[in-house]
Amino acid sequence: MPRLAYLLKKFPRLSETFILNELLGQEALGADVTVFSRRPADDEPRHPQLARLRAPVVQLPPSKEVDPWGELFAEGDDELLPRVRAAVAALRPYGHPRFPSLLAEAVLLRRLAREQGVGHVHAHFATDGALVAHLLHALGGPGYSLTLHAKDIYRDTVDARLLDRLVAGSAFSVTVCDANVEHLRGMLGADALSRVRRLYNGIDLALFAPDGRVGDADHVLSIGRLVEKKGFLVLLEALALLAREGRAVRATLVGEGEDRALIEARVAELGLSGRVRLAGALPQDVVLDLMRSATLFALPCLVGEDGNRDALPTVLLEALAAGLPCVSTPVTGIPEILDGGRAGVLVPERDAPATARALAALLDDPERRARLSRAGRAHAQRCFDLAVQAHVLHGWFAQALAAAATPAAGRPTCTSPA
């Protein structure tokens, strides 16, 4: 049976727990997986669950170190050079600035995929890795599928024409929430849309099961990369409002990111230094312990100035499964996570007073917190069970791998767009 390959920008990556979960879910169902990492992994904590992963991780060399012509001549395939020419002609109109280096990656990956016995490639995010997968297939390599998330479809810089081509060339393209599907309806043509399938990310419900612990009083937990779209500055404003009311609320913010200095400065400006702890990046076992000791979870996500946003924040899924009452915003797929407000509290984005009121109301009402805890756990069991989601995805991969064994399996067209 051909192998399944994941083509990722970096692996492992602390902030991409959903990818590790997905890989473990596929292996649990018997998939034979190889991971191709396009860049070296960052020096950061590792999730303990990584030790369970059996898949080999193949580190690709930097594209500037790849000799595409040497690879081409080494292949000895008379059809390869014409395919390269056709791919270059077809994609030249998009003017992708890194196209030459991505083509070099695809040529190298063609050989590596054959050596690894790869029959299908899956890429997360419709960014450079997806284009490499598309080129790989156009050069005679295995077919591919995609998972579309948020930055790859919402940012102002997204090229809708190229996105349409990548999705249309895929065996199928997953996206992680219904809100994304609706957004894609306005971006993609009929052929590409026919390949889009909604599948929620799944989490390990046994790992995140509530343990019956009573959370610390007035302890708000928030987790995410320290970037604009997570809404941490709004959360700090809300906490400052609660502090001015004389409440003894405290908060732990878990994560690292480009806005750390900005957030640290704002903590000091608002007089929250004794109340807010920036814990940095932490592995999943430590995060789980924090979830079980907090009173509630808050993540006031927002749409960034560049259009970027969260689609289906994994930490909200985890908090929900752990029975931690959640406060968030109606951005993208978050209402789907919180069941339209039945499994958590939704407040307007960028609204610190509304966020403060929601936090205060929950901190003052243990019975409501208990109701939301039960409702959140039940909703996670219905919609975000890793075992269930893995089965669905496994079936799609099996179909793609079976199609790969058929000589008539199609390839992306190598004609230029009109």
Protein language model annotation of sequence segments:
Residues 1-64, 114, 142, 168, ...:
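N-terminal subdomain of nucleotide-sugar transferases
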Residues 179, 202:
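Carbohydrate-associated surface elements
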Residues 212-240, 252, 297:
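Conserved donor-binding/catalytic core segment of Leloir-type glycosyltransferases
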Residues 264-285:
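Nucleotide-activated donor-binding/catalytic signature segment of Leloir-type glycosyltransferases, i.e.
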Residues 275, 354, 361, 368-383, ...:
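A short, well-ordered alpha-helix in the C-terminal region of glycosyltransferases
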Residues 275, 292-307, 324:
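Acidic donor-binding loop of glycosyltransferase active sites
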Residues 316, 321-328:
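Short hydrophobic beta-strand element within catalytic cores of glycosyltransferases
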Residues 340-341, 345-352, 361-367:
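Conserved acidic donor-binding segment of nucleotide-sugar-dependent glycosyltransferases
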